[in-house]
């Protein structure tokens, strides 16, 4: 098994990603290969936001207002019917949004730890590392439009308010 498919690698990668987007300077001990992969994921989330700016602006704020309580519901809804690279980039973009817009940038708090634990647990528990080969990361970036992601985002835009009102909706 490739080290990039191990839970330990992804736990390290998710932590480094969240610390990077939180602008925390504690990355001295992180392996350079992990930092290269973090850079790739950041590039993907930037591309994701360029393609889906209207959904990003309209839905993340209200949907993630109570992120501590409802983050796992959002992730479950995101992956309920299919797992693909576009949706996994959306997973990372949700974490990025929480770090940049909801939590205090430039620090690493208990809330950051909670976000890190939630994302890591969900990613590993659902074995997402076997659906997201980093070797193909930029190929996935160019295929955003063909992965059905536009449909997914429109569906999420409709169901997020219901998810966060306590109803579990399957897209």
From Swiss-Prot:
A Pfam family annotated for this UniProt entry: Bcl-2_3
InterPro entries, sorted: Apo_reg_M11 (IPR029450), Bcl-2-like_sf (IPR036834)
GO biological process annotation, one example: symbiont-mediated suppression of host apoptosis
Localization (cell): Host cytoplasm
Keywords on record: Disulfide bond, Host cytoplasm, Host-virus interaction, Inhibition of host apoptosis by viral BCL2-like protein, Inhibition of host autophagy by virus, Modulation of host cell apoptosis by virus
Role played: Plays a role in the protection against apoptosis mediated by cytotoxic cells during the immune response to acute and persistent viral infection. Contributes therefore to latency establishment. Plays also a role in the inhibition of host starvation-induced autophagy which ultimately contributes to the viral chronic infection.
Protein name per Swiss-Prot or TrEMBL: Apoptosis regulator Bcl-2 homolog
Species, as recorded: Murid herpesvirus 4 (MuHV-4)
Phylogenetic placement of the source organism: Viruses, Duplodnaviria, Heunggongvirae, Peploviricota, Herviviricetes
